[in-house]
Each structure stands twice: as C-alpha cells, then as structure tokens.
C-alpha cells in the first residue's frame, strides 16, 4: 500500500494486466510502448521505460521450436529451445551448476537478453537498442532466481538501479 501511494505521489504509471505488444523506437530511443487489454490498444509515452515482463515461465519471452526472443523489442535470445541445453531430463541436473547455488540450473532458467552496465538491452552490434529502456528482474538473464532464491532481491535491486539511471 505504501509503495503504491509513493508511486502515485511521484506520478509513476504502474501498468498491470496488459500485454505489451510493441514499441515505437525512434533515433535510438523508445518513444512509446503499445499495450493491448480487452481488445483495446493503448500507447504509453514516457521519458524512460523499465521493463519487468518476466522470463520464460512468466511469458516475458516468446518461444518457438527453433527460436526464443524478447517480443517487445524483438531481441533474439542466446539459447535455441531445440538445444539439448534448453532443459535436461533430470529436475536437478548435476552437469550445470550455477556458481553459488545449492542446485544446478536448466538453460531456460538462465535465459535473458544481454544488457549493459546500466541494464539497457543490447542489440546484435553490442550497443544499447534504446538509451532509455531498462530491463529488470526475471527479464534479465544469467541467474536462476528459483535455484538461488534471489528473485525478489534481484527484482528490487535492479528496479532501484534502473530507476536511478532512467
């Protein structure tokens, strides 16, 4: 309740129960996000955008047999869903241990787009796709929130960091 009051006080739009269906990118910046809710399309313009759409299980990524990608900005993800590394037969595969975690990770659990030091998603050329877009929480790759039991901590710390850089 306190967080929602603070967000309202500082004029922050929190958009829930909507699907982001696209982005309007102009001159290296995101000008707007397009959402759909109950068949209605809406355009949100802002100075900066913090994206917290989730990972594979939260439907933040689109997946087909030969491709996985982040759908808002059409970012290809580094692991092919047809790869044997996508998931292994064992629930807790011994061959892939995430450093510092009590159990190993499946490839899909570590999936996410590459970001720079400010959490901006990178294009194929290694440069930020948009100077004003920041990815946080489970949208980030390289960590297994379930195995590490770090989901809330990563979500909160990356949200604060992104907000400070936005």
Could you tell me what each predicted segment is?
Residues 1-166:
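Residues forming the flavin
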């Amino acid at each position: 309740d306190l967080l929602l009051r603070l967000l309202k006080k500082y004029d922050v739009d929190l958009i829930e129960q909507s699907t982001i269906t696209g982005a309007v990118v102009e001159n290296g910046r995101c000008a707007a996000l397009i959402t759909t809710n109950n068949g209605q399309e809406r355009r949100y313009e802002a100075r900066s955008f913090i994206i917290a759409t989730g990972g594979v299980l939260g439907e933040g990524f689109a997946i087909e047999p030969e491709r996985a990608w982040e759908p808002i900005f059409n970012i290809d993800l580094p692991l092919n869903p047809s790869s044997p590394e996508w998931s292994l037969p064992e629930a807790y595969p011994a061959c892939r241990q995430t450093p510092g975690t009590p159990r190993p990770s499946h490839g899909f659990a570590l999936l996410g787009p590459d970001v720079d030091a400010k959490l901006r998603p990178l294009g194929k050329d290694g440069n930020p796709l948009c100077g004003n877009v920041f990815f946080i929480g489970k949208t980030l790759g390289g960590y297994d929130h379930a195995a590490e039991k770090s989901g809330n901590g990563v979500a909160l710390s990356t949200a604060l960091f992104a907000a400070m850089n936005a």
